[in-house]
């Protein structure tokens, strides 16, 4: 049996695999905000990024390691291909964290070896112990992944795992890289690894999976039954293609069905001891933060965190819930932090009252950020009678998105109606040369006119592929949240903003998307799965953060 920590370790890869979702690129401040919230959530490991990808990625991982990595906090992990250049960069990036991990990987399936790496099985058997041993010389906590494990030859997989553990790997990750396997197959694979790898008891078995067939969470739960003790997942299940296993779904499945899973940990079915260290009341806030910052809207019927997750339309269901919530609800909404709390703050409220409420909600803002958030609060309070926690979340999320902005909106003015052509006047500040220009455009509607004017000013060719708007809270004076997605060179960039005026929100969301596009093209990152290992052996960005 593999090394057993006595519970499930939650390894969050939102900032690495999650950010690889189309349009989900994040700047440094956004990554840092998410990392702080993941620490409050109680994840065991934060995979902060792929340090070798670019100087920006290195800096982000390094900053998270120093700011979020604490002695009693999460382990900070970086991803590295099985090459010295990657591993060295990873080590330097995570080095400020008291608890640090290097996560190195290489493919083990024949299809990946032949068509991607151009390597033989013999090559892999030589690379794995050499690179794991090198990583071990730098840090004690080493995770090794067999990429595309679910499509690998089992006997070869066992051999690779045994070599990795002998070389010093403390965690062995079994990825279902393309979301190919089924629950029974994945459970059997974990069971067979436990049976056929002689030194497996020296490492924790981890699983990583994608949701291409909608089976990622089910696969993981079956893996838990067969000995997996670390689950690699993302907030809202974001990730490449159809996404990753969803953290909130996994955690709440283990929470709600604890009596069922307890037996697989040799516990009494009625044992009250939690199966994870997650503070479930932080789930909803974490979900909303990630959604706001990535611009990836959560589908309404998404389990646990969707807008309809605790809604009842049927009269029979409504009647039952009113009599006893347990008739149709298996989770108390408060367990995941869902609350309709309203705060009695208005335009006469002071900074200390706003700060106190933000601290109660888990936000720890610097003096400068608090001043900016308070200014936004006062502006909103002039236009909205009641301020809710959701409004404050929107204000803070909006503030986090401001850094690394080439373009800033100075003015938006729109004229429209059923007897006139929608016309927008936009003034845009270019922060790089501190110049401001104004443009006027006509569109099919007010938002189209705004986007046309912004494109004239920004001169960044793109295609608008999605526009969506929803209210943050109830009422005619509610904040409107706008999400915009644009495309350039087959890459997607998202922007998000909230305002009581949805046209202003749309303008800011579009500018956010443009800023992400510009930032991403400057960043010029490489992808961990699509570059040859040879590219990283001799090219290393030493201290790119300086």
From Swiss-Prot:
Record protein name field: 2-isopropylmalate synthase
Keyword Manganese: yes
HAMAP family linked to this entry: LeuA_type1
Gene: leuA
Compartments where found: Cytoplasm
Keyword terms: Amino-acid biosynthesis, Branched-chain amino acid biosynthesis, Cytoplasm, Leucine biosynthesis, Manganese, Metal-binding, Transferase
GO CC term, one of those recorded: cytoplasm
Binding site for Mn(2+): 17, 208, 210, 244
Documented EC number(s): 2.3.3.13
Record keyword Transferase present: yes
Cofactor(s) needed for function: Mn(2+)
Annotated segments matching region Regulatory domain: 408-546
UniProt GO molecular function: 2-isopropylmalate synthase activity; acetyl-CoA C-acetyltransferase activity; manganese ion binding
Span of domain Pyruvate carboxyltransferase: 8-271
Subunit structure: Homodimer.
Catalytic activity: 3-methyl-2-oxobutanoate + acetyl-CoA + H2O = (2S)-2-isopropylmalate + CoA + H(+)
Family from the record: Belongs to the alpha-IPM synthase/homocitrate synthase family. LeuA type 1 subfamily.
A Gene Ontology BP annotation from the UniProt entry: L-leucine biosynthetic process
Job of this protein: Catalyzes the condensation of the acetyl group of acetyl-CoA with 3-methyl-2-oxobutanoate (2-ketoisovalerate) to form 3-carboxy-3-hydroxy-4-methylpentanoate (2-isopropylmalate).
Pathway: Amino-acid biosynthesis; L-leucine biosynthesis; L-leucine from 3-methyl-2-oxobutanoate: step 1/4
